[in-house]
């Protein structure tokens, strides 16, 4: 998973599939960002085509961790099929989701 920066905002580019096989890798990299003191994170889903319930759990854990640490995590560039999964799971109510990375960065 690549991670870019825009000022003090970290932008992890979420891998194409986040499922039971890959969720731990994604979680570890996101946890590294938070434990490294990053408090503004934009998760870029432009490369992601699929997320399972295991993947959703990773992002829910990250949201809770960021809220505890006084940080913010937002999502951007979700493809329609991925957005539908977030909608069906009720996660669209929990996360701020933006069409573009630029909009997401402005929110932080």
Task: Describe the residue ranges of each PLM region.
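Short acidic-hydrophobic, aromatic-tinged amphipathic segments that line or gate anion-handling sites
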Residues: 96-100
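Short beta-strand/loop segment at the start of cytosolic alpha/beta domains
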Residues: 1-13
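Acidic phosphotransfer microenvironment of two-component signaling modules
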Residues: 80, 102-103
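Amphipathic alpha-helical interaction surfaces in cytosolic regulatory modules
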Residues: 20-94
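Conserved catalytic submotifs in the C-terminal HATPase_c
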Residues: 8, 46, 102
């Amino acid at each position: 998973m690549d991670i870019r920066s825009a000022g003090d905002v970290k932008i992890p580019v979420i891998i194409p599939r986040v499922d039971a096989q890959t969720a731990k890798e994604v979680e570890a990299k996101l946890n590294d960002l938070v434990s490294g003191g990053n408090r503004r994170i934009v998760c870029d889903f432009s490369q992601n085509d699929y997320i399972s319930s295991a993947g959703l759990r990773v992002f829910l854990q990250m949201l809770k961790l960021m809220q505890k640490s006084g940080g913010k995590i937002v999502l951007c560039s979700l493809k329609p099929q991925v957005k539908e999964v977030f909608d069906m799971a009720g996660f669209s109510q929990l996360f701020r989701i933006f069409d573009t990375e630029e909009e997401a960065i402005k929110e932080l």
